[in-house]
């Protein structure tokens, strides 16, 4: 029997669940107040804080870390990777700590999972991280030769929903074409065809959402950038 800890660190919450095979033992979402998160200068500074919450949640629900057989986590902003499960190692954790593609709370997932797994001599995995890249080349072109669109999105949720749609329709995942939309702190839109996400509108170029400005008129962005009111860090935070 497998006992699996699942961790999903998001911008405003840390979601935790434990499964015995496919039976859910418990699930909880710990919401983080703005003033709590704003104590930390960098996202990775939240590592100890969030790991402590995960371990406390296990204890609260009567689950010993030593009983676990695997730790699964939401993946962070790694370089482009294929869809599916990827085993976590120290190199991955170092990449997310020192050279993430972008700053996001999901970068904490693999290091927390790896730490708990190492302490209990079990494997840790991430699944469908936000940097899954299966986009066709045509979808990466923009109106400026020096710029290319990037494959970034909420793949964990969108791919799961595409799989669920296929199953509910009595079809194979590889045989459906489906548009998926993730609506959370950021909104991403993807299209799946033949089992791959061939195009994606990430949360910085599509609809605005509670934590993202979304696609904006380029001339106005340029005006704000050169207004002298913002440095690059402040402007990125505003967007």
What are these regions (language model features)?
Residues 2-7, 67-72, 178-182:
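Short glycine-aspartate micro-motif
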Residues 7-12, 181-186, 192-194:
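A short acidic Gly-Thr/Ser loop motif
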Residues 21-24, 84-95, 116-122, 141-144, ...:
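A glycine- and small-aliphatic-rich helix-loop capping segment at beta-alpha/alpha-beta transitions
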Residues 27-66, 92, 96-101:
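N-terminal phosphate-binding loop and adjacent alpha-helix
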Residues 58-105, 123, 131-142:
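Short beta-strand-loop/turn "lid" adjacent to the catalytic site in phosphate-handling enzymes
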Residues 70-73, 123-129, 179-181, 191, ...:
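General beta-strand structural signal in soluble alpha/beta enzymes
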Residues 108-115, 126, 141, 146-177, ...:
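Glycine-rich phosphate-binding loop plus the immediately following alpha-helix
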């Amino acid at each position: 029997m497998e006992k699996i800890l699942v961790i999903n660190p998001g911008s405003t919450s840390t979601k935790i669940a434990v499964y015995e095979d496919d039976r859910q033992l418990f699930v909880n979402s710990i919401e983080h107040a703005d003033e709590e998160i704003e104590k930390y200068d960098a996202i990775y500074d939240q590592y100890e804080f969030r790991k402590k919450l995960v371990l406390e949640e296990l204890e609260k629900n009567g689950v010993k870390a030593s009983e676990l057989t695997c730790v699964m986590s939401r993946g962070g902003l790694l370089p482009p990777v294929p869809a599916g499960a990827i085993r976590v190692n120290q190199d991955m954790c170092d990449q997310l700590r020192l050279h993430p593609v972008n700053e996001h709370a999901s970068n904490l997932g693999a290091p927390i999972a790896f730490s708990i797994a190492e302490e209990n001599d079990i494997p840790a995995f991430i699944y469908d991280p936000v940097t899954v890249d299966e986009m066709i080349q045509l979808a990466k072109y923009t109106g400026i030769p020096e710029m290319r669109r990037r494959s970034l999105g909420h793949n964990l949720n969108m791919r799961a929903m595409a799989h669920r749609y296929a199953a509910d329709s009595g079809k194979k995942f590889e045989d459906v074409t489906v548009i998926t939309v993730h609506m959370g702190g950021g909104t991403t839109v993807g299209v799946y065809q033949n089992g791959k996400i061939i195009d994606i509108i990430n949360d910085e170029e599509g609809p605005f959402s509670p934590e993202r400005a979304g696609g904006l008129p380029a001339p106005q962005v340029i005006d704000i950038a050169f207004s002298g009111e913002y440095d690059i860090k402040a402007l990125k935070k505003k967007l």
